[in-house]
């Protein structure tokens, strides 16, 4: 069965290799491709993150560096990779210019946005709203990290931009997963990727399918933080239909990423 990993953080070198045990690997784009291939994943998407901490002094130059590395990985990996890029509410004009630049290059995926790594937090702030207004004009998709203490802010962001598709990352534990399910029922433009914490709880995916349907759930791993093969097997083991598995593992991602 085809598998698309909607949520990865690819890397050029050890500087971008977000893994708890980096001494066990020799990170490079070639190693990434081989590693992902072992899990029989045929396509990946996601933003580049840097192990070097963000500072206000470095500002948007830090953000642009991550985005440029995503473009370089796209050059190396070709059709195997859909790059995601970062924006930042402290830099509205620069972020809008980055949206325009990426759109001109055919890049339509914002994120995964990871506010806690980049010195901001409020998904409903007016500055991010202005940036997302611009993204709406280009038909982009926004992937964002679930901020567990930002439940109302996440909802306001989704409500304010009905023409954007939003994908929250990580089901988390049951308390927060149930909150996501309520949003999935309510908003046609909202999806959940199953990366990170969550799907090792057996039955979580089947419960989500029962409550909202498999069309709103998207496969992701959070590689290289998480073991990609384990996540593939977690979906295949769930008591859901083959059609549901296909929707989750690749069809929903194909629709959002506009890949075939």
What are these regions (language model features)?
Residues 1-10, 15-43, 214-216, 229-260:
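Mid-to-C-terminal alpha-helical segments outside catalytic/metal-binding sites
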Residues 1-22, 67-86, 188-191:
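Mobile, glycine- and charge-enriched loop segments
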Residues 7, 36, 70, 102, ...:
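Conserved, mostly hydrophobic/aromatic
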Residues 21-27, 52-62, 87-95, 117-124, ...:
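Acidic-and-aromatic substrate-binding clefts and catalytic sites of carbohydrate-active enzymes
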Residues 58-141, 199:
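Active-site gating/metal-coordination segments in enzymes
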Residues 108-109, 122-218:
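Catalytic pocket-lining loop regions of alpha/beta-barrel enzymes
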């Amino acid at each position: 069965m085809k598998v698309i990993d909607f949520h990865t953080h690819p890397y050029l070198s050890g500087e971008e290799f977000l893994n708890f045990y980096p001494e066990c690997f020799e990170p490079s784009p070639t190693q990434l491709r081989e590693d992902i291939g072992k899990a029989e994943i045929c396509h990946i998407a996601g933003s580049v993150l840097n192990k070097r901490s963000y500072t206000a002094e470095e500002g948007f130059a830090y953000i642009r560096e991550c985005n440029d590395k995503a473009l370089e990985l796209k050059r190396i990996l070709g059709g195997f990779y859909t790059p995601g890029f970062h924006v930042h509410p402290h830099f509205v004009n620069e972020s809008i210019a980055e949206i325009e630049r990426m759109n001109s290059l055919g890049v339509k995926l914002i994120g995964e946005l990871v506010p806690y790594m980049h010195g901001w937090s409020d998904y409903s702030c007016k500055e991010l709203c202005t940036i997302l207004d611009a993204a709406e004009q280009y038909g982009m998709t926004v992937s964002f990290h679930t901020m567990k203490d930002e439940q109302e802010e996440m909802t306001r962001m989704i409500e304010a931009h009905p023409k954007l598709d939003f994908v929250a990352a990580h089901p988390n534990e049951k308390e927060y997963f149930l909150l996501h399910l309520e949003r999935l029922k309510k908003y046609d433009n909202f999806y959940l990727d199953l990366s990170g914490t969550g799907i090792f709880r057996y039955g979580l995916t089947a419960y989500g399918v029962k409550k909202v349907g498999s069309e709103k759930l998207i496969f992701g791993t959070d590689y290289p933080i998480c073991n990609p093969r384990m996540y593939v097997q977690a979906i295949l083991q769930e008591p859901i239909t083959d059609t549901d598995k296909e929707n989750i593992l690749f069809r929903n991602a194909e629709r959002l990423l506009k890949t075939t």
